[in-house]
Regions:
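Context-gated lysine
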Residues: 6, 15, 29, 46, ...
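N-terminal capping/small domains of soluble enzymes
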Residues: 1-99, 104-109
Length: 259
């Protein structure tokens, strides 16, 4: 890997600036048949909670003309299985790349307990705090829309985790800057912009809503969030979600142009 691609994310050195987005990449093993996770600067695993979660009932996705609606519900094996099961953290640690563990919880104490346990796992290079998921009844976005709640949560995790902390922010606020500053004040080393947008389509056959938006139209909104915040704080802001072909250039461009 070319030396010129090396970059830093807080105190964490990456061999290149490309990281997988949480939720789109599973835990690495899901994509091994068509891409080697080791080519990335880091892999960000799907969200992990203190206890296992089954996720939302099927169907969980809904295609629209301009993007995909999803309501996965944070299905995951829980922190115990994530640490001990060979399919999860042990397998992620075998890749030649940085390992970022995405955490989600209903309470501050849940985030703290997971951070405390992962601090003793040498394979974990960084935490990404999911304080922005719109598809869960408790926690998640409840923290990420309130600057003070964001600061308290990040601060509590910072006291229990000694390495890099990334706060994953929500776009579903009027102004993301106060949330970003609160995360920074709490001890976050970097920000991940942004989680899915709240959206709704209606299944007219069942008269039911389909929620949470990602993909094509999101790539027109998320660069604005990142560029606006970069101009405000001149921070490194990792982008979130998966995009086809050369669209990633729009994201890196909006950051570098603003600095």
């Amino acid at each position: 890997m070319a030396e010129t691609l090396k970059t830093r994310l807080g105190s964490l050195e990456l061999k290149n600036p490309i990281l997988s987005a949480s939720g789109t990449f599973g835990y690495g093993k899901e994509v091994e048949s068509f891409v080697d996770p080791s080519v990335y600067g880091g892999i960000v695993g799907k969200s992990i909670s203190l206890e296992p979660r089954k996720g939302n009932p099927l169907p969980r996705t809904w295609e629209t003309a301009s993007g995909m609606l999803n309501s996965i519900g944070l299905q995951n094996p829980g922190i115990d299985a994530f640490i001990s099961d060979p399919s999860y953290l042990p397998r992620m640690s075998a890749y030649d790349t940085r390992v970022v563990v995405n955490l989600v919880g209903d309470t501050v104490d849940e985030y703290v307990e997971m951070a405390r346990r992962l601090d003793s796992e040498a394979a974990v290079d960084a935490l990404e705090l999911n304080i922005s998921c719109p598809n869960c009844p408790l926690g998640g976005m409840e923290f990420g829309i309130d600057p003070e709640a964001t600061r308290r949560l990040v601060e509590a995790v910072r006291e229990n985790f000694s390495r890099t902390i990334i706060a994953k922010l929500t776009p579903n606020v009027t102004d993301v800057v106060p949330i970003a500053r609160a995360a920074e004040a709490g001890g976050a080393d970097a920000l991940s912009l942004v989680n899915t947008y709240v959206a709704m389509a209606v299944d007219w056959r069942q008269r039911r809503p389909r929620q949470s938006f990602s993909h094509q139209a999101k790539r027109k909104n998320a660069p604005w969030q990142s560029g606006f915040l970069s101009r405000s704080r001149h921070e490194q802001n990792p982008q979130s979600n998966g995009y086809p072909r050369g669209n990633a250039r729009q994201f890196t461009g909006c950051i570098h142009r603003s600095q």
